[in-house]
């Protein structure tokens, strides 16, 4: 992420930050968002939870048959890497085309995410359950995290952040 100016808000969606890993890359993405964020700027993003990766996706295979295509979606959880490897294959009946995609999602503990946000000048304003928008539960599959930037990079460089 390199921008030509500052931003007042960033709202990555659709599990964007869940796809950033391992943790040093996740931290770098937060650092870059913070670098361009103005004081008072809002950072809102969703993140799949470790619960979802361990208990909903891990080891699961989904076969979906539709009129125009068949989809095979498989998930493999790697506890050591805190990562779900996802493979999706779609076969289109009419054209005979085959689509294949493989990607990973990474798990981060909520306290780790909050600590990284704070490290780069964000105050965590709210963490909500990503399905109900209510309080986070132990079985929440997704979090929506709202953080507010407390100072600019210039203020930090000058030692005037408060």
For the regions a protein language model found, what residue spans apply to each?
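A short His-aromatic
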Residues: 18-20
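SAM-dependent methyltransferase
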Residues: 24, 44-116
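Residues lining the SAM
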Residues: 13-15
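A short, glycine/Asx- and small/polar-enriched loop/turn
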Residues: 7, 82-84, 138-143
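A short glycine-rich, Lys/Arg-flanked "PGG" loop and its adjoining helix->strand segment in the class I
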Residues: 27-39
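Short, hinge-like loop/turn segments at secondary-structure boundaries
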Residues: 10-11, 60-64, 143-144
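A short acidic, Gly/Pro-enriched loop at the edge of an enzyme's catalytic core
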Residues: 2-10
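C-terminal lobe and adjacent flexible extensions of AdoMet/dcAdoMet transferase-like proteins
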Residues: 108-162
